[in-house]
Every structure is written in C-alpha cells, then in structure tokens.
Amino acid sequence: VATLDGKSAYADADFVVIAAPTNYDPVKNYFDTTHVEEVIDLVLAVNPNAVMIIKSTIPVGYTRSLYLRYARQGVKQFNLLFSPEFLRESKALYDNLYPSRIIVGYPKQMNHPDFADEDQAIASIADVDRLRQAAGTFAALLVEGAIGNGEPFTFDGPLPIADGVCPREKTKGIPVLGMGMKEAEAVKLFANTYLAL
C-alpha cells in the first residue's frame, strides 16, 4: 500500500531506504542533508530496530559522523548502512536493471587515533555483525531486482560481502562489494567526479 505517512510506512519495516534530496549548497560548500536527517529521526522515533540504508549523495565521512552524533544524543541502537547508486542521467531504469556494480557500506572499526571517537560510537550503538549481515541481505535484494546477465538468482539469504567482492556466479554477473561506509562514500564521490568530466 502506497502512503505519504512516514510513521505507518516505517512502523513494521525491516529496511528503510532513504533516497531524500541532498542539494549542493554553494554558500556552505556542502550537501544539504536536512531531509536525510528528518527521515532518520522519524525512523528512530517509530521503529529504532529498522535498518536504514542511505542511497542519497552525501559527503565522505557523513554516515560515521551520524553514528557519533546519535551516540552523543543517547540513542541506544542505530542501524545505518550506505549503498550508493550509480545512475546516469536519462538512464536510471537501465542502470538499475543492469547495474555496473552494487556496493553496500557498513560500519567498520577503523582502528586509528583520528577515528577513535567514531569507532567508540559505533561500538556503543551498533550491532556490527547484524549490520554486516543486513548489508549482505540488502545486496541480495538489489541483485534479485536486477536483470544483470540474465542468470537465475535464488534469494537464499545474505550475500557474503563482508570480505570484499562477492563471487559473481552468485550475483547474475554483477560485481557486488561490501566495504566500510566511508570507503563507499568515497567511491560514490569519485564516480560522480568522473561522470562530471
């Protein structure tokens, strides 16, 4: 059932895909992530157990900063992934059916002093093993919805993306990669930069 009521839409959801606009603000020299954060706040209020997947274009480091922000706000559980989309202008349907790659970023410990606060926040409010599994499940759903090379695909659980590239014989020939969220954000940035050239 289609609805414009976020509360009813998110109440029983396992996954909430956030594809809100993030317009570039030339004054701030930054993406306006206000709408993404509004969705996150509503999901946390209605269904904090749901896994949220950001598909919007966001700055590098944004998702890890959200873990830090929500940990400081006292949130007990925060389930956030990032899965960039690689859609060309006027080719969105084709690019969804025949994706050049599927990437799902999940929270990983960076184990470096510069990221100690973020690592601690992630450890305190995220079940990293559950989110790694959820990333594999979401990747499998994206493969299931794609045509790829036309090979049959049977959803039988999460794809094994935790250690990098999933074997292509499991993914209709589509490269499927799991990585840290900051890495996934950087891949999206580099792809956008390349397409802008």
Residue ranges and their predicted role:
Residues V1-L197:
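Structural/interface elements that position substrates and couple domains in central-metabolism enzymes
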